[in-house]
């Protein structure tokens, strides 16, 4: 049996903060909520599941892991989920997206990858940042449906390692 999935695109800073944006004046999470309503309708018509990537971004911002407004500078200690165009995801944003998709498709706790997992390392994400993003992904997935808490089941190396030998 084939299972269809839709993932929600996250809120776009370029549609919230500049005066020309469609959601100008709205809180950043409002765009995510509005987009979710549309995805839920499409998913229902296609008998598909929605993967909560946009909600995970909103959670990262509301919990202080990520900055809400890249146009006013990034607050110290917070991650910028957008790249330079404030539309597409940064490395952090795409890593969070991948964690949410991984957990949604497999039903596994994203924290089971461990903070030294090779993808985060190869992307230049620190172990502390990996841990925070894995926690956000887990918290969002837990809120949306059943996921078994199972942090770090893989052997943990002393330090991060590359994904494949060269």
What are these regions (language model features)?
Residues 2-5, 28:
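Cell wall/extracellular polymer interaction/catalysis modules
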Residues 52-58, 115-117:
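Acidic carboxylate-rich catalytic motifs and surrounding loops in phosphoryl-/glycosyl-chemistry enzymes
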Residues 4-6, 56-57:
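Short glycine-enriched loops at secondary-structure junctions
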Residues 61:
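Non-catalytic carbohydrate-binding regions of carbohydrate-active enzymes
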Residues 1-3, 49-52, 103:
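Structural recognition of the beta-strand scaffold that forms the well-ordered cores
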Residues 71-166:
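Conserved catalytic region of serine esterases and O-acyltransferases that act on ester linkages
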Residues 64-66:
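Short helix-loop boundary/capping segments
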Residues 9-55, 77-78, 82-95:
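Substrate-gating cap/lid alpha-helix
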């Amino acid at each position: 049996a084939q299972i269809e999935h839709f993932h929600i695109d996250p809120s776009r800073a370029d549609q919230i903060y500049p005066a020309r944006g469609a959601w100008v004046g709205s809180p950043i999470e409002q765009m995510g909520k509005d987009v979710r309503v549309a995805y839920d309708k499409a998913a229902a018509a296609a008998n598909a599941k929605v993967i909560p990537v946009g909600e995970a971004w909103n959670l990262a911002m509301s919990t202080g892991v990520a900055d809400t407004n890249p146009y006013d500078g990034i607050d110290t200690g917070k991650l910028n989920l957008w790249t330079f165009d404030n539309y597409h995801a940064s490395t952090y944003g795409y890593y969070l997206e991948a964690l949410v998709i991984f957990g949604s498709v497999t039903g596994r706790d994203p924290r089971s990858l461990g903070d030294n997992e090779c993808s985060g390392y190869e992307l230049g994400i620190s172990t502390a940042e990996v841990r925070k993003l894995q926690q956000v992904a887990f918290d969002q997935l837990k809120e949306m449906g059943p996921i078994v808490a199972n942090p770090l089941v893989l052997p943990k190396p002393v330090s991060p390692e590359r994904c494949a030998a060269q």
